Amino acid sequence: MTAYYQQVLEGTYDNHVLPFLWMKGESHKTIAEYLEKIAGADIHEVCLESRPHPDFCGEGWWRDLRFVIDECKQLGLKLWILDDAHFPTGFANGAAKEAVPELRKIVLTHRTFDIVGPTSAASIALANMLDKTERFYGVTFMQDGSPVDVAYRVFDDADGNPSRLVFDAPAGLTQACVIFTSGKTSYNEDYINMVDRASVAQLIDAVYEPHFEHLGDEFGKTILGFFSDEPGFANEKGTTGPDGISDTLIGKATAPLPWSAELERRLRAALGERYLAELPHLWDREPAGAHVRHVYMDIASTLYKECFCDQLGDWCRARGVQYIGHVIEDKDCHARLGVGAGHYFRAVGGQDMAGVDIVINQLVPGMDRGLHSYGRGVWDLEFYNYVLPKLGSSAAHLDPKKQGRCMAEVFGAFGWHEGLREMKWIADHFLVRGVNWFVPHAFSMAAFPDWDCPPHFYAHSQNPQFAHFGQLMSYMNRTASLLSGGRATTPVALLYHADAEWAGKANFMQHAASELLRAQVDFDIVPAEAFEDAGRYAVEIAADGSGFSVNGQAYRCLVMPGAEFVGGAVLDFAARAAAAGVAVYALDELPNKRYDGDTAGREGFASLDAAAVADIKLLATTELADTLANTGMQTVVCAEPQPWLRALRYERAGESYLMLVNEHPKQGISTQIALADGTPVAGARLDLLNGTEPAAFDGTLELAPYESCIVVLGATGSVAVATAEDEATCVDGPWAVAFSAPGTDAFGESVELADLHDLSSAEFPGKAGTFRYRASFVLGEAATRTVIDLGEVFETATVTLDGKSLGTRICPPYRFEAAALLAGEHALTIDIINTLDHAVPDVFGMTEPSEPSGLLGPVRVLG
């Protein structure tokens, strides 16, 4: 039987990309043109997004979708559908806006009043002239931060609504925390309530059911499923601090909180008689509120999962389709309220794939730490590099429903400076971190240029690099096919910081994550619920001390980011693991408090003594990678440190793959690698991007900037290609250069260049398109095997030698095999396509530099 990797090389692989196609009511002629372009780019699935469509879920929408379905059948395409009139999901096509109050979004708010006593018959007006939906819920009186019993009376107005609170304030300073429910929020007020099952059902009734009614005959056939885009609690938008982090953490003093009757019922049951007295701690970060904050977030995020994600996923699966999408993970919102969903693993729990999203230059090749300005704020690049993709791939590994599948929405809103070279870098970034499905963002059928979140693929033939877009899509399909259907090797379980952060001070995961991946130590992020929810997670500790598994995914140790608080289930696991000889590490500090248990329920938290954390080893974050490397946890061991090398080990159907990626855009990697046990890395090195023959690999790793490869361990390959030391001649010119604008094959008059330089700053300012270089060179003697090396290129290159095409390269290394060449003169033609930002400005590129244009060289013939 042919090995699977050989089948992939021979063209038998699965589709793993489903780009957005924005639907705004365009003509069927335009839609047909775009679907043909999509299918022609080795893409076999597409996700339709109303952006917005003028008649979403109306006759115009159904007419357009029937046309799309007919076209897709002819082209061999399958469909996904974004599940609302516009993003973010939750508008329910306007249904929530017209719904009765109990089906609309509800939040819990408070106002604090200071009363200097003793004061008899102190009075507080309960009416809010700015919010007619606000209703009195309850009051807690406090002195010196502790609840006190104060009798009070509530007087109603003529309509029967509470209007005034009257009480006798005791001596001293008394704070009255008056709590209200409200239907008014500052963000997406007309959206469904994510913690209310009946409210979420409005989305099903308004969008999902009409699609089934009109197109149900195509469910599970042409229509594969639905896509939720960036749903969240939407209790507020929140603000972002100078560190690039959202402020929507539970305990924020001014935050309205998600609320529903079911949330109230569960919260009352969990808190018992202390219920009302504990609620004020939802708006502070004091240790005494750790228990109630954790209980609230635990309930709210669980209800989000049950009411929203599970309900939609169950509806889809019952009708033969799948449910996918992503929430907002940015700015550490994945563990917070606001635009977030509180707990990433629960937020995507009902989906058939995990999902994440990268946008607006949140990745910058060569910059993996620090803050990057994007014009309206800053991004914490350590999070986007080392945590964001791993959230998704970890959920895919841990949830059996997902079968190892994780989707990433990629390329969107970077700006026109993002070309195929950076897109390939982004694709590798996700692939080597375990992501194996992609939603490229986006095909826009609006008139060019469309200012809505470029770049756009094809763009009515005005995106010149679209000519080679299919090469990137084929590469992503091939690589993702190899990295699907098996299991990644992730020896480290990194504890998800959400629970600890809800309770008190906690370090983010990204500091530990960056130390691990920069040392080629792979990991999954594992939530605390894995150690407490036996219904969803099966945890087994190996009796021989070799490690433990969660739902079949094997780990050798647990690493806890530094935190003040920990839960009892994690402590219990640490004790059992230590007894079996499995290491549990805490970074930089040991937890000293519990947020759960009987004592925490009474006092707000429970202090931990040394015995309680004796099974946890304290370790500095800066020592983490070396400690784990010394115990054999590296995916590969390099002869010297390689902080820009990323490595993934993947086992599939008896085959073992190593994906190796150089993530530095300027520096090459040259090293010797071995497996952690000292075994030499030997096998066949695959070039899935350019389709060259598999090369024999003996552990000597050479990767140019932007370059990646997959090594099939134990397989055989051909001889290595020519190296830079084999130079035969240098092509010095002169060069004749002509320009062709996008959408045309015609070239203008040539200009002569004495040397190679940036064309945008000299002969062709403000131009984006194809630059055709012509030159000749003389080979002094015949060569049996030659390679053309173009040096620096911006940014795609197609080479023709003596009238024969040598192919296209969309990123470094720009090397082309030319086989045997006779002595004498040879004609060289090189077509270079730059990026559209040189001709079309956009707001997303206002904080991003422009690359040069053209061929910078040096151009060498190797052989």
Task: Kindly give the residue locations of the regions a language model identified.
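A glycine-anchored, Pro-Gly-centered beta-turn/N-cap motif
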Residues: 817, 822-824
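Aromatic-lined ligand-binding clefts that engage carbohydrates, nucleic acids, or primary amines
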Residues: 777-779, 783-802, 809-810, 828-832
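Exposed low-complexity, polar/acidic, P/S/T/G-rich flexible segments that act as propeptides
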Residues: 840-863
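Carbohydrate-binding surfaces of carbohydrate-active enzymes
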Residues: 7, 13-22, 27-33, 45-51, ...
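Short acidic/polar inter-strand loop motif in beta-rich domains
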Residues: 184-186, 717-718, 833-840
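Acidic/aromatic-lined carbohydrate-recognition and catalytic surfaces
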Residues: 48-166, 177-201
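An active-site-proximal structural segment forming one wall of the substrate-binding cleft
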Residues: 199-225
